[in-house]
Amino acid sequence: MEVNKISEGKTKIVYDFDKDHVLLEFKDDITAGDGQKRDILEGKGVLNAQTSAFFFRLLERNGIETHYVGMKDERTMIVKKLKMIPVEVVLRNIATGSIVKRLPIKEGEVFESPIVEFFLKDDLRHDPLLNYYHMEHLKLMNRKEAQHIEDIMMKVNDVLFNFIKSKGFILYDFKLEFGRLGDKLVIGDEISLDSMRIRDGNSRIYDKDLYRKGYDLKTVKSSYEEFLKRITS
């Protein structure tokens, strides 16, 4: 069956599939700095597709709806056709990344309660931080929808944090994207080491921060492989 490409981003391609579904193909591209840094990491697409599928199934088993339907092949998902919202939603358990640059918060500081932040998906503007007023003015979502997403993020965090902890890792933070399916808000995109920060008890990095910090591609790939192996064993 010939499929038509709908769109292509930095790390994934969306293809038409049927009336209610699309295909999401994971590429081997790895990027950082709003796409300013880019390489090809052979096998990364498969690793991220498999990791994402695993976590989507985990969330579904815990009553949290995602766009995941199944796998077409090892790097391509069949997913529900959502109207995606161009907002990245980040939940932080432990301080690292941009928040320690923006605010007087120390690296590694543990938050008493998780912090949820919204960012506009806009590489040219470097994904600016959004509040409820911005999102309403830009017609991205209303306050009630944003608060509902915050509730979903907290539920997702409960599931992911405890599961990941059981495998010997610590979930510092993660990013999700949402889309509309009728009047529902549903988790879309991916849940992989490109979109979460994972450490072990010795503060060893397993996620895309390795690439951001200049580690070689072999180290990045071996960490992605080890993480997937451990969570699925």
UniProtKB/Swiss-Prot annotation:
CDD domains: SAICAR_synt_PurC (cd01415). GO terms for biological process: 'de novo' IMP biosynthetic process; cobalamin biosynthetic process. Pfam families: SAICAR_synt (PF01259). Its EC number is 6.3.2.6. Pathway: Purine metabolism; IMP biosynthesis via de novo pathway; 5-amino-1-(5-phospho-D-ribosyl)imidazole-4-carboxamide from 5-amino-1-(5-phospho-D-ribosyl)imidazole-4-carboxylate: step 1/2. GO terms for molecular function: ATP binding; phosphoribosylaminoimidazolesuccinocarboxamide synthase activity. It catalyses: 5-amino-1-(5-phospho-D-ribosyl)imidazole-4-carboxylate + L-aspartate + ATP = (2S)-2-[5-amino-1-(5-phospho-beta-D-ribosyl)imidazole-4-carboxamido]succinate + ADP + phosphate + 2 H(+). This is Phosphoribosylaminoimidazole-succinocarboxamide synthase. It comes from Saccharolobus solfataricus (strain ATCC 35092 / DSM 1617 / JCM 11322 / P2). The lineage of its organism: Archaea, Thermoproteota, Thermoprotei, Sulfolobales, Sulfolobaceae.
